[in-house]
Amino acid sequence: MADLITVARPYAEALMGWRKRAARNRPGRMHCRRLPAMIADVQAQAFLTDPERRDAEKVSLLSAVPVAVDVKAWKAFLALLIHNDRWPATAEIGTLFADAMRRAEGVVDVLVTSAIALDAGQKTAVQSALERRFAGHKVRFREAVDAALIGGLVIHTGDLTIDASVRGQVQQLARTLRS
């Protein structure tokens, strides 16, 4: 997953740059939801991986997704994804782009996973730490429970993951011992 996020980052940044420069017909969240949904289709994947298909045919397929943006720029973006064989990362591109849009709007979505449910005091402490970390942004806090963490927290937002769990520390220790 980290590899796809690494691949996706420059494309998400390009979309965000396009969004900032365009006065109208700018890419939005819906564009980044529709494209991965289309690519998730088995027939679309077969078409996109078919070596007999030309890049122009693949771009034509993907540009069939209705979007209210500058069509020429959208097709150029799709052609870049196809030419560089980055179309499998569209879901990650969409996620990173949506995160960048929320940050530009002053909002950061954070998923906090813990081994057991956090009590009100712990939630408040984590919330304040996150607000300090993301100063100037409104932090939207979601919580999940994963007993496999044993203890501690894993904090995830966009392409940033902070693993302060017991499981993460044990895995790090195991990697160190193997080295």
From Swiss-Prot:
The keyword Oxidoreductase does not apply. Keywords: ATP synthesis, Cell inner membrane, Cell membrane, CF(1), Hydrogen ion transport, Ion transport, Membrane, Transport. InterPro entries: ATP_synth_OSCP/delta_N_sf (IPR026015), ATPase_OSCP/d_CS (IPR020781), ATPase_OSCP/dsu (IPR000711). GO terms for molecular function: proton-transporting ATP synthase activity, rotational mechanism. It comes from the Bacteria. It is found in: Cell inner membrane. It is a peripheral membrane protein. PROSITE patterns: ATPASE_DELTA. Its main location: membrane. GO terms for cellular component: plasma membrane; proton-transporting ATP synthase complex. F(1)F(0) ATP synthase produces ATP from ADP in the presence of a proton or sodium gradient. F-type ATPases consist of two structural domains, F(1) containing the extramembraneous catalytic core and F(0) containing the membrane proton channel, linked together by a central stalk and a peripheral stalk. During catalysis, ATP synthesis in the catalytic domain of F(1) is coupled via a rotary mechanism of the central stalk subunits to proton translocation. This protein is part of the stalk that links CF(0) to CF(1). It either transmits conformational changes from CF(0) to CF(1) or is implicated in proton conduction. F-type ATPases have 2 components, F(1) - the catalytic core - and F(0) - the membrane proton channel. F(1) has five subunits: alpha(3), beta(3), gamma(1), delta(1), epsilon(1). F(0) has three main subunits: a(1), b(2) and c(10-14). The alpha and beta chains form an alternating ring which encloses part of the gamma chain. F(1) is attached to F(0) by a central stalk formed by the gamma and epsilon chains, while a peripheral stalk is formed by the delta and b chains. Belongs to the ATPase delta chain family. This is ATP synthase subunit delta. The gene is atpH.
